[in-house]
Regions:
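Hydrophobic h-region of N-terminal signal peptides that target proteins for export
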Residues: 8-17
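N-terminal intrinsically disordered, low-complexity segments enriched in P/E/S/T
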Residues: 18-163
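Positively charged n-region of N-terminal signal peptides that target proteins for export
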Residues: 1-4
């Protein structure tokens, strides 16, 4: 029995501090800062294939930047933070143009935001606000249209810094 417990603890410890697989394509997302799991010099890099291999979730919603209801698909932000072994919920989200948003993830965790890579079943390109867009379910929670929530919906997301 003691051996079984010791093996279980060893397995759990190795999962918490596990090495992430390296991306095989160009990374589109980097999670850095206070993280435990990395695959690139203290950071966790993800290519599109890695994000698509994670459990996918869909948010169907309208928002100020589109005229009609859109179907967005991608992994939950909470799953990505867990995979990287984030040790804090204070985040800085950085877009391709270096636009930054400071966010306390606990403030929006209940809404289960996703990092959308697909808009209406099409992979989002940079010209379409891709490759990643933090998406909130505004139709289900109209209060998300108010400040500061709509500021958190950063598009062309390239990195998350855990502070």
């Amino acid at each position: 029995m003691k051996i079984l417990i010791a093996l279980s603890l060893l397995l759990c410890t190795s999962l918490v501090a596990a090495e992430l697989p390296k991306p095989t394509d160009e990374p589109i997302l980097t999670i850095a800062g206070l993280i435990q799991n990395s695959n690139s010099e203290g950071a966790a890099d993800f290519d599109l294939k890695m994000l698509q291999a994670m459990p996918q979730h869909t948010i169907v919603t309208r928002h100020p930047w589109v005229e009609s209801r859109h179907h967005y698909k991608g992994p939950k932000v909470s799953d990505l933070l867990e995979m990287a072994g984030a040790r804090s919920t204070k985040l800085t989200l950085v877009a391709l143009n270096n636009y930054e948003v400071e966010i306390e993830f606990d403030d929006i965790a209940e809404f289960e935001p996703i990092l959308a890579w697909s808009d209406n079943d099409r992979v989002m390109r940079v010209r379409d606000k891709g490759p990643l867009w933090l998406m909130l379910p505004i139709d289900k929670h109209p209060e998300l249209l108010q400040m500061p929530y709509n500021d958190f919906m950063i598009w062309q997301l390239r990195s998350i810094i855990v502070k």
